[in-house]
From Swiss-Prot:
The gene is rnfD. Its EC number is 7.-.-.-. GO terms for biological process: electron transport chain; transmembrane transport. The lineage of its organism: Bacteria, Pseudomonadati, Pseudomonadota, Gammaproteobacteria, Pasteurellales. Its cofactor is FMN. The modification FMN phosphoryl threonine is found at T186. Belongs to the NqrB/RnfD family. It comes from Glaesserella parasuis serovar 5 (strain SH0165). It is an enzyme of class 7 (translocase). This is Ion-translocating oxidoreductase complex subunit D.
Length: 355
């Protein structure tokens, strides 16, 4: 005798938590590389962000009368906190990451109704607010540890984050100024300054050639390579789709190489741009957010290309050296329109004008 049961009759182990866990795992190599080049600060920031995220998720669950496990089990809050922690300078004051996580989870996620309801990428909302509100703290990137006379120890890292000075009394800006020829900004600032202020062809060529080497010496090339490898793993495991990162990187690369070709004097800038800043981070781990990105196959290509175009415009012609966060948020606004006009044709219907 057969037993009648209700649908669904097929089940999948691809739960939300599994997807989030894969994404977190794919970010860990970049986390380790960032620690290798920039010190213990990244681990402290990540621990602080994740701990606060857990507290916020529990508090929201209590306020809404839900079981605590209901909000913690999907790991979305932890992923948001980790993304934000890896996006800010490792030795930013503790209150920077605290404000960022609160804004990302409370205002950008739970105010809209929680996971799946938010219109904008929560981590990028938090990051953009921090960048606009606290530009000094958000641009205080230490040079790689190998370039520092006295790299911060674990005790120094805690002291810098919670007391703004090392155990010997040096601030982040003093550590930055102690290294000749190295500024607190990334290689993107150097590219922008070189293109805008140097007119001599020989000098410009030499400086822009040096930028590509700075990407590797400064650690940004290795960090982006780690994000690239992690992103390729996610595509292989079908955790994310290939359309968004390929369209984003392809559009940006095409425009960057075209700019280099037209300028005639710019060499290596496109390569340096692709492997510096948050380019690979944004392409594989931020723009691919399944809630705030386009959901149709054609829409993913359009969305990714739009993000790549906006990053190009901001980096080459805007005031900010990176621009990934603002590009993703601006593209999020266009998602409903993109999805509306890229819906695939229903099986059995004819191509024609949309009614």
């Amino acid at each position: 005798m057969f037993k009648m049961i209700s649908s669904p009759h097929t089940h999948s182990n691809n739960l939300t938590a599994n997807f989030m866990l894969w994404v977190i795992g794919a970010m860990l190599p970049a986390l380790v590389v960032q620690w290798y080049f920039f010190g213990y600060g990244i681990f402290i920031q990540a621990s602080l962000a994740i701990g606060l995220a857990v507290v916020i998720e529990i508090a929201v669950a209590k306020l809404r009368g839900k079981a605590t496990a209901f909000y913690l089990a999907d790991l979305s809050g932890i992923l948001t906190a980790l993304i934000l922690a890896m996006a800010i300078p490792p030795y930013a004051p503790y209150w920077v990451i605290v404000i960022g996580v609160i804004v990302a989870l409370l205002l950008a996620k739970h105010v809209y109704g929680g996971l799946g309801q938010n219109l904008f990428n929560p981590a990028m909302i938090g990051y953009a607010l921090l960048l606009v509100s606290f530009p000094v703290q958000m641009t205080a990137w230490l040079p790689p540890l190998a370039l520092l006379n006295e790299p911060p120890t674990l005790a120094d890292s805690f002291s810098l984050i919670f007391a703004n000075v090392t155990t010997d009394g040096f601030s982040v800006h003093q550590l930055i100024q102690s290294v000749d020829g190295v500024s607190s900004a990334t290689v993107l600032d150097g590219s922008k300054q070189a293109m805008s202020s140097i007119k001599d062809n020989v000098t410009l060529g030499i400086q822009l050639d040096k930028l590509f080497a700075d990407v590797l010496v400064g650690g940004w090339g290795q960090v982006n390579l780690a994000f690239l490898l992690g992103g390729l793993l996610l595509i292989y495991k079908r955790i994310i789709h290939w359309q968004i990162p390929v369209a984003m990187l392809g559009t940006f690369a095409l425009l960057s190489f075209a700019t280099d070709f037209v300028s005639e004097t710019a060499r290596w800038t496109a390569q340096a741009q692709l492997f510096s800043g948050a380019m690979m981070f944004g392409a594989f781990f931020i723009a691919t957010d399944p809630v705030t990105a386009s959901i149709t196959p054609k829409g993913k290509l359009i969305f990714g290309a739009l993000v790549g175009l906006l990053v190009y415009l901001i980096r080459y012609y805007g005031n900010y050296p990176d621009g990934v966060a603002f590009a993703v948020l601006l593209a999020n606004i266009c998602v409903p329109l993109i999805d509306h006009y890229t819906q695939p044709r229903l099986y059995g219907t004819k191509l024609g004008r949309r009614q």
